[in-house]
């Protein structure tokens, strides 16, 4: 019975290389074989095979296994056996192994069981209250199997084959009998999506010295004594070997998934000994074979290769060259002399190349400090003027003066100078001015002491312990400095600097990390008692490009670290995105490519989604056939019917752009026919295609209704002849129809072709209406199944159809544009032919999205030198910003740059990020994530008037020391408060409890997060100019599951919540932002620019207008009256008319203005009437309009000119604008 049914919906496959057994070529295809007849049938989707097993489990007897409410919930097979044994005749079908998706309960033929039964013990992998329970083995037909495994635990079938072969020399068939097989009985051996599975132990390592481990699933230390299983070739030419250990391990790590997904692995070769068990074809696993899509159907504008990036190199020159060289020489001599003082007791003190040796041995860690000090000495001369060429000459002369005799060291020094050569002179000078000049000691003296102490630490550490690594040898710490027992004067001037504020009496000492307030009884105070530097006005944390961190001094220009030093005055340790242990940066071109493709991403996801929907149709049609023809489960049949119908409705309701993309996927040859046959007659007759200057193809119009009918017939019908007839509805020219009828070999098409041509419009209208109104799509499929009855009924119904003429609105007028756009995406990105991007049953959204991006975007750039996991982390960080903004390109790019700018501790933007949005859209998670990465001060208060709700002194100091100031759920604030915190000038003097007053340079940037609209009293242009608005209206919802395509979630604006997702993003986001900081700085300022990124974004302009109309009567008035300045306006508007329209517009203010506006202004008693209701003074509003549009107002004639606006009540904008994204 099963044999007869399967032939109707499963493709027959031959025994050739495409479908060769043991050859892993497709992770989704499953082949079943009839051992009696040799027939092989293909399940194109694992989901179809699962549905097949679920349906036949109860052997056509009532509900399926899934919906049988009376079935036992135990993990054993006995209930199924007992129930099915009464009705089963048995079959001969087995499944050929596919280790990507097939896991089993262990089983073995009876003839082999006697060999292994004494040696099998699974209790090492499971705990049970019943000893021996997991090892219980029972007979089923010709087999023995272990039934008592947990539901989500399995055995890799490939691993089971290898285990039996390696341990016992047993070779088992690469097939698994299907439930109700004659030789097995009513036992289901298959396990889908196990949490863990047993496998032989594997280790994949490169053949480098030392080798790099790419994959392991156990803890054995593999060596040459272990057997090889696979040899893998990598993109950079490296060879990796996968070794196998015959012992079992229990893990969730699938080796085949790893090698399939790693874009740096290109070929996998099985060693000859195990070719009979498994072969892996990586190319076939990754790409569909039938991908010969003709992308040259239309001329594409973006066919040129990217031009190489060219950066001009300026030549070094200076009118002050002699002065620069002299100061360099004097400075180097002074630094050398003071280093000698520190190392006086060491034999290295006599080394004439002491400074050079220090730099080389320390790997130039603090070489930049020498640049800063010598430049500060140069610029102290008021007669010294300079430009970029002078700076370049200074850097080159400095390197040459130090390393003239050492070419390798010279090249390294010049390399260290490269970042500074890219900066403008103001930026370079600003960086050097970070170095504080303690005028009680000459700059070269203190730097010489600093270098000398550092070198002495190295010499001491290396003499004591030879096994320390480089960083440990050069660790510039409090403990290491103290252990040297150097003279106090040297130590205090070179490292432990002490400061005293003579105004407040506060003492601070550099503690090896940052400056801390000390008291007389503290050890640091006593250590520096006689070496105090007194200041009357000292500001801390006044830094931009260099600042103290837990890893040392961070340099924004080089994205690297120097040793901690006392010459940067800081009382806090800001966090940075770079860590000393990070891998090297991706190439700049590769990173910029990531950001540049952001604009294409929605189109990429949309194009993929079209293909995904078509595959789903195919899968659901097969499932529908399975549940209808092979089972009797009403629930399954209803579920499949609804699922297929929902998908049909989604396809039927596609917009024009998506319809054209769908047509390309479903029937690209017909689309090519449209392009050719709907051109003008001269172009159709031209052999080579369109005439060079003819643009007729841009005027091609397609009847939307006809196209929808054709696409549904192709997708939900299975008859080529009927499809050929229906596609004739697209074409109106008789030549095409007659040619089709001549070329066809179908009598059916010839019989009805003239009818379709003659009744063209009627047929379109009738079929469109029929399909549109059909209740369930399976009813349409039934109609298509009997084409002759379908045509008979169609002729009868069309005969009664009235004549119809289609309107212009029935056409897809932008056919060519949509077609060209779709082809452009398909030309650039392999979204329809890559198998790896297909969603897997175990995928969640972040996992799938990362894999998709790695394959479609990152595979297009050369990143062979980088590990797959490192690349994946950077991609995950990038995709976080995309998901958070619902893939809004402009908002995502701006937030990336804003977040990266937090690592530059100065508020240069004068902008506050305002994030209103729906609850559950991820706003809180955004600042919680940033809290892991930077110093964030968060203050929750719904009202900041500037006069109340002030924070405590400790919190004020915390805020001044922070990198990000976040206010959650701020409902109202004053104009003065907002400008104060969003402005760049934020110096302030504050003190912690029981500590003295200190002056700080506040460097935080402001973030406001709200669910409800914010009210700012006295809202004006200054307030408006300080806002960057990112609105979010999507939601992360518990009940939403990953739909297999991110575009589905983008459309619905509902995303699944993944537990612990944000915590796992800390490192990926940090690594990604480190790249933004490295490559996206403005060379003019050295800053990461973010405030102008939304300047031309239409959505941001709209959202800014929404905020303004909600807060300001003036902006509300401008919006309601639709006032616009237009140079060519011919009419003028008198002052009386303006006042009249203001009077009308004011009546709508209550709908536009924030509720807090009236309350606040009534309290201030501005324009308030005795009835305690707020009244707007129309004369005041008129004057505000005059001020706002002063360039369009003639004071002499009292008229407005070059302006358009609503001149009557009906033209007013009375619809309140809402935020959009």
UniProtKB/Swiss-Prot annotation:
It is an enzyme of class 3 (hydrolase). It is found in: Host nucleus. One of its GO terms (molecular function) is DNA binding. A motif (Nuclear localization signal) lies at residues 692-701. One of its GO terms (cellular component) is nuclear viral factory. Its EC number is 3.6.4.12. InterPro entries: DNA_helicase_Baculovir, P-loop_NTPase. Pfam families: Baculo_helicase. Interacts with IE1 and LEF-3. This is DNA replication helicase.
């Amino acid at each position: 019975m099963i044999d007869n049914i399967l032939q109707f919906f499963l493709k027959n496959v031959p025994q050739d290389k495409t479908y060769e057994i043991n050859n892993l070529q497709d992770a989704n295809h499953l082949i079943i074989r009839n051992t009696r007849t040799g027939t092989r049938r293909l399940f194109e989707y694992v989901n179809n095979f699962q549905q097949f097993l679920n349906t036949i489990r109860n052997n056509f007897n009532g509900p399926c296994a899934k919906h049988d409410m009376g079935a036992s919930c135990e993990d054993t097979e006995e209930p199924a056996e007992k129930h099915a044994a009464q009705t089963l005749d048995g079959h001969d079908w087995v499944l050929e192994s596919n280790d990507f998706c097939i896991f089993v309960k262990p089983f073995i033929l009876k003839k082999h069981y006697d060999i292994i039964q004494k040696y099998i013990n699974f209790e090492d992998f499971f705990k049970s209250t019943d000893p021996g329970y997991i090892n219980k083995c029972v007979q089923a037909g010709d087999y023995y199997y272990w039934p008592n495994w947990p539901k989500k635990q399995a055995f890799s079938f490939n691993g089971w084959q290898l285990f039996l072969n390696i341990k016992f020399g047993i070779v088992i068939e690469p097939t698994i009998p299907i439930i109700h097989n004659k030789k097995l009985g009513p036992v289901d051996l298959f396990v889908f999506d196990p949490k863990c599975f047993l496998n032989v132990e594997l280790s994949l390592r490169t053949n480098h010295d030392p080798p790099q481990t790419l994959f392991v699933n156990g803890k054995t230390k593999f060596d040459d004594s272990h057997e090889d299983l696979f040899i893998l070739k990598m993109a950079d030419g490296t060879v990796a070997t996968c070794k196998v250990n015959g012992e079992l391990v229990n893990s969730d790590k699938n080796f085949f998934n790893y090698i399939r997904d790693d874009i740096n692995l290109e070929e996998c070769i099985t060693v000859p000994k195990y070719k009979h068990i498994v072969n892996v074809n990586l190319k076939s696993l990754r790409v569909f074979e039938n991908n010969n899509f003709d992308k040259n159907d239309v001329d594409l504008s973006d066919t040129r290769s990217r031009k190489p990036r060219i950066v001009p190199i300026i030549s070094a020159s200076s009118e002050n060259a002699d002065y620069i060289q002299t100061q360099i020489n004097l400075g180097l001599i002074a630094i050398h002399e003071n280093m000698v003082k520190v190392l006086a007791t060491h034999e290295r003190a006599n080394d004439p190349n002491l400074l050079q040796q220090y730099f080389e041995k320390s790997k130039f860690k603090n070489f930049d400090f020498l640049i800063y000090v010598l430049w500060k000495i140069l610029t102290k001369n008021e007669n010294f003027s300079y430009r970029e060429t002078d700076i370049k000459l200074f850097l080159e002369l400095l390197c040459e003066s130090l390393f003239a005799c050492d070419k390798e060291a010279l090249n390294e020094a010049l390399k260290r100078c490269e970042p500074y050569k890219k900066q403008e002179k103001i930026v370079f000078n600003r960086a050097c001015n970070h170095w504080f000049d303690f005028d009680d000691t000459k700059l070269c003296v203190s730097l010489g002491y600093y270098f000398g102490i550092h070198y002495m630490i190295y010499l001491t550490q290396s003499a004591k312990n030879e096994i320390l690594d480089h960083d440990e040898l050069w660790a510039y710490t409090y403990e290491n400095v103290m252990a040297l027992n150097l003279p106090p004067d040297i130590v205090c001037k070179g490292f432990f600097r002490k400061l005293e504020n003579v105004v407040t009496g506060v003492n601070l000492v550099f503690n090896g990390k940052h400056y801390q307030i000390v008291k007389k009884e503290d050890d640091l105070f006593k250590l520096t008692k006689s070496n105090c530097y007194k200041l009357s006005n000292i500001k801390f944390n006044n830094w931009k490009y260099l600042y103290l961190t837990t890893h040392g001094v961070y340099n924004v220009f080089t994205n690297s670290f120097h040793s901690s030093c006392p010459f940067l005055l800081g009382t806090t340790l800001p966090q940075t995105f770079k860590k000393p242990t990070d891998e090297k940066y991706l190439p700049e071109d590769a990173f910029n490519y990531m950001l540049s493709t952001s604009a294409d991403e929605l189109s990429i996801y949309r194009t993929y989604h079209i293909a995904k929907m078509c595959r789903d149709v195919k899968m659901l049609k097969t499932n529908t056939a399975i549940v209808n023809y092979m089972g009797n489960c009403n629930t399954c049949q209803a579920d499949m019917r609804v699922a297929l119908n929902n998908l049909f409705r989604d396809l039927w309701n596609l917009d024009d752009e998506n319809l054209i993309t769908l047509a390309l996927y479903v029937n690209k040859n017909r689309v090519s026919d449209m392009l050719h046959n709907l051109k003008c007659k001269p172009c159709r007759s031209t052999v080579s295609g369109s005439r060079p200057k003819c643009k007729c193809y841009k005027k091609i119009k397609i009847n939307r209704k006809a196209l929808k009918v054709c696409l549904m017939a192709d997708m939900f019908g299975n008859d080529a002849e009927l499809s050929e007839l229906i596609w004739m509805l697209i074409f109106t020219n008789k030549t095409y129809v007659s040619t089709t009828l001549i070329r066809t070999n179908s009598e059916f098409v010839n019989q009805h072709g003239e009818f379709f041509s003659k009744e063209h419009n009627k047929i379109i209208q009738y079929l469109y209406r029929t399909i549109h109104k059909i209740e369930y799509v399976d009813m349409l499929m039934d109609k298509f199944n009997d084409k002759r009855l379908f045509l008979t009924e169609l002729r009868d119904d069309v005969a009664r159809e009235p004549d119809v003429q289609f309107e212009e609105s029935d056409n897809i007028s932008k056919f060519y544009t949509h077609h060209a756009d779709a082809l452009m995406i398909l030309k650039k990105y392999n979204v329809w032919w890559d198998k790896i991007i297909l969603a897997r049953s175990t995928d969640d959204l972040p996992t799938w999205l990362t894999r998709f991006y790695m394959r479609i975007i990152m595979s297009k750039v050369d990143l062979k030198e980088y590990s797959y996991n490192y690349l994946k982390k950077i991609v995950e960080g990038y995709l976080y910003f995309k998901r958070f903004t619902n893939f809004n390109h402009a908002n995502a790019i701006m937030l990336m740059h804003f977040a990266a700018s937090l690592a530059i501790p100065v508020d240069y933007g004068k902008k506050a990020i305002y994030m209103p949005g729906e609850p559950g859209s991820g706003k809180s998670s955004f600042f919680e994530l940033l809290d892991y990465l930077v110093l964030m001060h968060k203050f929750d208060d719904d009202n900041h008037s500037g006069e109340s709700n002030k924070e405590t002194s400790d919190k004020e100091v915390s805020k001044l020391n922070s990198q990000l100031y976040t206010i959650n759920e701020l409902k109202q604030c004053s104009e003065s408060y907002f400008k104060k915190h969003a402005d760049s000038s934020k110096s302030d003097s504050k003190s912690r409890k029981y500590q003295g007053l200190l002056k700080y340079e506040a460097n935080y940037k402001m973030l406001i997060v709200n669910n409800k609209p914010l009210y700012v009293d006295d809202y004006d242009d200054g307030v408006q100019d300080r806002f960057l608005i990112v609105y979010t209206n999507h939601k992360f919802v518990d009940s939403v599951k990953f739909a297999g395509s991110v575009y589905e979630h983008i459309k619905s604006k509902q995303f699944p919540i993944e537990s612990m997702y944000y915590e796992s993003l800390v490192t990926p986001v940090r690594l990604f932002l480190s790249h933004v900081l490295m490559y996206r700085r403005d060379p003019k300022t050295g800053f990461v620019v973010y405030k102008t990124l939304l300047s031309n974004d239409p959505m941001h302009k709209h959202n800014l207008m929404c905020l303004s109309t909600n807060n300001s009567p003036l902006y509300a008035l401008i919006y309601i009256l639709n006032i616009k300045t237009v140079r060519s306006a011919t009419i003028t508007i008198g002052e009386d008319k303006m006042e009249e329209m203001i009077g009308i517009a004011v009546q709508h203010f209550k709908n536009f203005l924030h509720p807090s506006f009236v309350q606040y202004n009534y309290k201030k008693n501005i324009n308030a009437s005795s009835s305690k209701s707020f009244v707007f003074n129309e004369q005041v509003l008129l004057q505000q309009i005059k001020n706002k549009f002063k360039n369009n107002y003639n004071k002499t004639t009292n008229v407005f000119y070059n302006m358009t606006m609503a001149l009557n009540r009906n033209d007013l904008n009375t619809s309140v604008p809402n935020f959009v994204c």
